[in-house]
Curated annotation (Swiss-Prot):
One protein family per Pfam: IspD
NCBIfam families in UniProt: ispD (TIGR00453)
Protein name per its UniProtKB record: 2-C-methyl-D-erythritol 4-phosphate cytidylyltransferase
Organism: Yersinia pseudotuberculosis serotype I (strain IP32953)
GO MF annotation list: 2-C-methyl-D-erythritol 4-phosphate cytidylyltransferase activity
Reaction catalysis annotation: 2-C-methyl-D-erythritol 4-phosphate + CTP + H(+) = 4-CDP-2-C-methyl-D-erythritol + diphosphate
Pathway the protein contributes to: Isoprenoid biosynthesis; isopentenyl diphosphate biosynthesis via DXP pathway; isopentenyl diphosphate from 1-deoxy-D-xylulose 5-phosphate: step 2/6
Top-level class of the enzyme under EC nomenclature: transferase
Length: 241
């Protein structure tokens, strides 16, 4: 392990992967679909394990999952698994219980196979300057429309000046994230990402600019796009050798 990794706070990663991904219309959960020669979840895990500051990855799986244990990455000693819950917040909380005494926890979507190492490094660097944490995010470039309630018609255009697409990973002090998620769950607040729980509790995580090709595979057409990005990256890596 490098001196760089030892001198900075310990970071544990949690990868919620207990969902079934019904919008993909596939025969298996989307994280087990193959893209670029590996399953989506393998790409997501390897992008974390390749960084020297990530000590361990906790993969949160569905109680009836029989596929993760068959992957070669499941045998890596830095990988732990735990069963998740019905909602993302419950699954993340289950993962946090295995994080031990780590100072910081990084949560990454199992369905994001295109994370760049330099984006991850920029996010991890905030442990040196923030006590709240932050997320990878991309500024909104498209024109945004708000729909009329209940119908698919434009109500008005939304000012995109300060709008960002929330991405993952998202990085927070372990105990702070536990506290905020616990409160949100206890009070019945719907949180769609970990930053939402901190926002609910009055905190303001940092926005760290990330690449917009860090896509989440949600629909069938996303597979081809992820394949393109991964192939392009591999081609660039080969050209640099």
């Amino acid at each position: 392990m490098s001196n760089f990794a030892v001198s900075l706070p310990e970071v544990i990663a949690v990868l919620p992967a207990a969902g079934i991904g019904s919008r993909m219309l596939a025969d298996c959960p989307k994280q087990y679909l193959t893209v670029g020669g590996k399953t989506i979840i393998e790409h997501a895990i390897f992008s974390l394990l390749h960084h020297p500051r990530i000590q361990r990855v906790i993969v949160v799986i569905h109680p009836q999952d029989t596929q993760f244990s068959r992957l070669s990455v499941a045998q890596d000693p830095r990988i732990s698994t735990v069963y998740g819950g019905d909602q993302r917040a419950n699954s993340v909380m289950a993962g946090l219980q295995l994080a031990g005494q780590a100072e910081w926890v990084l949560v990454h979507d199992a369905a994001r196979p295109c994370l760049h190492l330099d984006d991850l490094s920029r996010l991890l660097s905030i442990t040196e300057c923030s006590q709240v944490g932050g997320i990878l995010a991309a500024p909104v470039r498209d024109t945004m429309k708000r729909a009329e309630p209940g119908i698919q018609a434009i109500a008005h255009t939304v000012d995109r000046q300060d709008l960002w697409h929330a991405l993952t990973p998202q990085l927070f002090p372990l105990e702070l994230l536990k506290l905020c998620l616990s409160r949100a769950l206890r009070e019945g607040v719907a949180v769609t990402d970990e930053a939402s729980a901190l926002e609910y509790c009055g905190y303001h995580p940092i926005l760290v600019t990330g690449r917009s090709d860090n896509i989440k595979v949600t629909r069938p057409e996303d597979l081809a796009l992820a394949e393109f990005y991964l192939t392009q990256r591999q081609s660039l890596n080969n050209d640099s050798l």
